[in-house]
Each structure stands twice: as C-alpha cells, then as structure tokens.
C-alpha cells in the first residue's frame, strides 16, 4: 500500500510540470495570451532611419554615424507651435530631468522646416536650454516615410523616440502623459546598453 502511494506521489510530481507546460503552450498558440501592450507609446513598424529623411543639424547633413550616440526625443512641427506643442516640449524636458543620473543618455530635438525654425528657435532657446534643432529639407519626403510606417506625422502634436543608431522606434501623440512616458524611457534605458 505504501509503495503504491509513493509511486502516485512521484508520478504526480513528474506529471504536473509537463501538464503546466502543455497547457500554457496550448493557451499561447490558441491566442489566449495578453492583448495589452507593455509600453505607453506606439511602436513604429518598420522603424524609420533618420539618415533617410533629408535632415540637417547645425547646418550640416544629419549624419548619424558622426553624432554622439545618445537616445533622442524629437518633436516634429509643421506650421506653428501651439499650446499643446509647447506642452509636449515641456514634458520632454521634465522627463529628461526626472531620468536623474540617466538624463545624459538623452538629447531633445525640435524638427521643422528652415522658415519655421527661424520663427520658433529664439523663443524656444530662451525657455528650454539644451534643446537642439533639426531642419527638415524635404517635408514631403519626411511625411511619406512616416506614412509608410503608418504614422500620420502632423495629425496632432507628437514626440518620437529614436535610438542611438538613428532608428525612430516609438511615438507618442496627442496629450502625452509624462509619467507614462518616463516609465517607458526607463524601461528602454534599462534594456539598452547603447547610448
């Protein structure tokens, strides 16, 4: 009797992990997995390479290979920078500050046409230190590249995250929640060893 009991206990101990693995595998492949995403921002698929967008930084062609390897927070502006646009730039600055010891891994940018930057730059420089400006040489090209990745660039205010290799990987649009953005950036920095 005790031999049978020991056998059943051993059999149970052996079969439970197999049963759990089998059920979880079936659960996953039948599509019952989680439907929510982990990050707040929207993933850009396929990612965009900044080097293909005909951009200038400091009056020179934007060459990712010669740039400092840092993560980038980029706001694209087409016409004017209204209240929501200014709020997005403000949130980007505050989130960068809240990254504390990791804040040196990020640089903040505003991208717009040369004519628009002439209007925007003086007021933004006086209010937001360490803000960099990217000139968009070909606005139609930039818009079409973003449309290929299913992103309507100027539908609402935006904030994009680009990795240190120049790939635009995440975007946020509309009213951006700074706390959720901060959580996303912390996850990115924790997972990344570059930049």
Regions found by a protein language model. Name each.
Residues 83, 87-127, 143:
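Structural microenvironment flanking redox-active thiols in thiol-disulfide oxidoreductases
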Residues 65-88, 92:
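Short active-site neighborhood of thiol/selenol oxidoreductases, capturing the structured segment around
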Residues 109, 121-156:
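Short, internal strand/loop/helix patches
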Residues 75, 108-111, 161:
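Structural beta-sheet core signal
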Residues 155, 161-195:
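Thiol-/selenol-based redox modules, centered on thioredoxin-like
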């Amino acid at each position: 009797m005790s031999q049978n009991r020991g056998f059943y206990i051993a059999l149970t101990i052996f079969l439970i992990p197999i049963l759990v693995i089998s059920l979880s595998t079936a659960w996953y492949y039948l599509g019952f997995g989680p439907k929510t995403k982990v990050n707040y921002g929207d993933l850009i698929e396929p990612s965009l390479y900044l080097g293909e967008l005909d951009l200038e930084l400091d009056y020179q062609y934007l060459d990712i290979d010669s740039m400092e390897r840092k993560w980038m927070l980029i706001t694209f502006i087409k016409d004017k920078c209204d209240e929501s646009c200014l709020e997005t730039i403000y949130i980007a600055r505050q989130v960068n500050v809240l990254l504390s010891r990791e804040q040196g891994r990020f640089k903040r940018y505003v991208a717009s046409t040369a004519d628009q930057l002439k209007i925007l730059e003086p007021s933004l420089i006086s209010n937001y230190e360490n803000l960099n400006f990217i000139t968009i040489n070909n606005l139609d090209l930039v818009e079409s590249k973003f449309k290929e990745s299913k992103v309507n660039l100027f539908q609402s205010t935006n904030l994009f995250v680009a990795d240190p290799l120049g790939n635009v990987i995440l975007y946020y649009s509309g009213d951006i929640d700074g706390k959720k953005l901060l959580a996303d950036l912390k996850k990115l920095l924790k997972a990344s060893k570059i930049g």
